[in-house]
Design a protein with these regions (language model features):
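Generic helix-packing signal
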Residues: 27-28, 75, 155, 180, ...
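Short, charged recognition helix plus adjacent turn
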Residues: 110-116
Length: 211
């Protein structure tokens, strides 16, 4: 992919428990913006270069290469590329009964809809593969959905947030760091971080000491 934008939009989005709605890639121009507005599906963006700002009702997130952000359905949002170093990203939009459960296990929340983790090229390559599999035949839809599950599995594995009930100490630390990094301008404290992670202050302290 070597031009500024490639995308595909499916005309069948309700056939499976998880269905790809759209997928693509874009190298944005400076200050290119979407919103304010709402989407009617979940939408993940994975930034591979540059930076920009993502605004939701819960906060404002200054993001850069390596960050992955989630747009929730029917939530008023805006996202804007940086003027001097505009972002370049891959995206995948999807719906289905499995979506909320999987995204929750990957560590996304409305309060912190961003994951910062070292994916190398794995996540980018997986999103690009969804695009390369795109088509409106039933077989295409199944292949795209299969690759979407793989993509979300990568997010779950690398984010360190397998589940709220069974997170490891490393998962606690990763989740707390993500929350702090993207909400520090709101004047948050330790209690906000522990409430978000879902553990006691002592448990989070021990996790940070371990990692």
């Amino acid at each position: 992919m070597n031009t500024d934008r490639h995308s595909f939009k499916s005309d069948q989005t309700d056939a499976l428990s998880l269905s790809v709605y759209n997928v693509g890639y874009e190298k944005c121009q400076g200050l290119h913006s979407w919103g304010s507005g709402v989407r009617d599906h979940y939408l993940i963006h994975h930034i591979i270069s540059g930076k920009g700002v993502y605004k939701t009702p819960q906060g404002e997130y200054h993001l850069s290469a390596g960050d992955t952000f989630l747009i929730y359905p029917y939530t008023v949002i805006t996202y804007t590329a940086d003027k001097n170093d505009p972002w370049e990203y891959y995206w995948a939009g999807f719906n289905g009964s499995d979506a909320e459960f999987i995204l929750d296990r990957a560590g996304f929340t409305r309060e912190c809809p961003v994951i910062s983790a070292d994916f190398g090229s794995e996540l980018k390559d997986s999103l690009e593969r969804i695009y390369r599999l795109s088509g409106n035949r039933s077989s295409d839809l199944v292949k795209m959905t299969g690759q979407l599950y793989i993509t979300l599995g990568i997010l779950m594995e690398r984010s360190g947030s397998q589940s709220r009930s069974g997170s490891t100490a490393k998962g606690y630390v990763t989740k707390a760091k993500n929350y702090i990094a993207h909400n520090y301008t709101l004047g948050i404290g330790v209690e906000n971080a522990t409430d978000f992670v879902g553990v006691s202050r002592a448990t989070l302290y021990r996790a940070f000491m371990e990692y």
